[in-house]
UniProtKB/Swiss-Prot annotation:
Modified residues annotated as Phosphoserine in this record: S66
Protein name as it appears in the record: ATP synthase F(0) complex subunit e, mitochondrial
GO cellular component: a single term: mitochondrial inner membrane
Gene it is expressed from: ATP5ME
Record organism: Homo sapiens
Described purpose of this protein according to its UniProt entry: Subunit e, of the mitochondrial membrane ATP synthase complex (F(1)F(0) ATP synthase or Complex V) that produces ATP from ADP in the presence of a proton gradient across the membrane which is generated by electron transport complexes of the respiratory chain. ATP synthase complex consist of a soluble F(1) head domain - the catalytic core - and a membrane F(1) domain - the membrane proton channel. These two domains are linked by a central stalk rotating inside the F(1) region and a stationary peripheral stalk.
Description of how the protein assembles with itself and partners: Component of the ATP synthase complex composed at least of ATP5F1A/subunit alpha, ATP5F1B/subunit beta, ATP5MC1/subunit c (homooctomer), MT-ATP6/subunit a, MT-ATP8/subunit 8, ATP5ME/subunit e, ATP5MF/subunit f, ATP5MG/subunit g, ATP5MK/subunit k, ATP5MJ/subunit j, ATP5F1C/subunit gamma, ATP5F1D/subunit delta, ATP5F1E/subunit epsilon, ATP5PF/subunit F6, ATP5PB/subunit b, ATP5PD/subunit d, ATP5PO/subunit OSCP.
Highest classification ranks of the organism: Eukaryota, Metazoa, Chordata, Craniata, Vertebrata
Modified residues (N6-acetyllysine): K34
A Pfam family this chain is assigned to: ATP-synt_E
PANTHER family: ATP SYNTHASE E CHAIN, MITOCHONDRIAL, ATP SYNTHASE SUBUNIT E, MITOCHONDRIAL
Membership in a protein family: Belongs to the ATPase e subunit family.
Amino acid sequence: MVPPVQVSPLIKLGRYSALFLGVAYGATRYNYLKPRAEEERRIAAEEKKKQDELKRIARELAEDDSILK
């Protein structure tokens, strides 16, 4: 087994700094995007509800207008 390699403290500091900055950036980006995504999901749900209602009405009209009464 190969012994562990000594890594410069400056390189370690750089790696951990980059890791911390990446985590901080991800957290702020998530907090920025989360409300926008919730709004998009709410709008999509409302549109789906409207489309379902229109389909239901069209289906009822198609059943009422059937030739085979």
